[in-house]
């Protein structure tokens, strides 16, 4: 037997299981320096635990395939400060790939086949973002994911509205009275009328809808959105992968600043639409949203 590291006896493997060897080892080894406290780390108090829970938001992004879930995930990570440059689902050449599609099969096929979890801090809160598969072949993974989240972001293709898989996933959320935020995506392509999309969500999903933003133009004439909650003008940033400006704050929809920043016909249409929205749609009700009976609708 030789002297091992830190004063321990170096015992041959064949002899380690003999009773007399175990007694020698116990006598020779230095006294353990682990205290009860180091073996059992101090548990957080109920106050600190409740504060940590209150800071945390866990949500899933759901939709029919190819509506833009993963692209939206990249933008949320970008604006949340978790990444410096957003990736693309179907990257070409040196273009950066999406962070949530990390498996080889996902990168080859340009689809998500398993849920990915990403965490980032923003505005004093910790967000757990789950990007889920949209294809029906992998829907079991999405169904299980929806049992572990507090809320969901439902992504709609502006040209197609509510599609088959979107409806199935919504029904899973409905069973849990889960709060849902609706995001109407791809407004820079040929799209359906936004009022028609709102009506479809209201009629088919039996939800009260309240627009949180409103598009300025559609398709090739899409210029950006007006933030109805904070009275901000959000113009399209042509740089698709880096952090853009936070928008132009306005004093209201009649602010002359809008006339300076937008074409006359776009301003007139925006004011007309916003007036109609505020007449026809209910104001945002936080309790109704938390109960799963109202969905705020964002366009982008």
Language-model features, listed with the residues they occupy:
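Generic short N-terminal amphipathic or hydrophobic helices
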Residues: 10-12, 23
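Serine residues within intrinsically disordered or low-complexity segments
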Residues: 33-38, 45
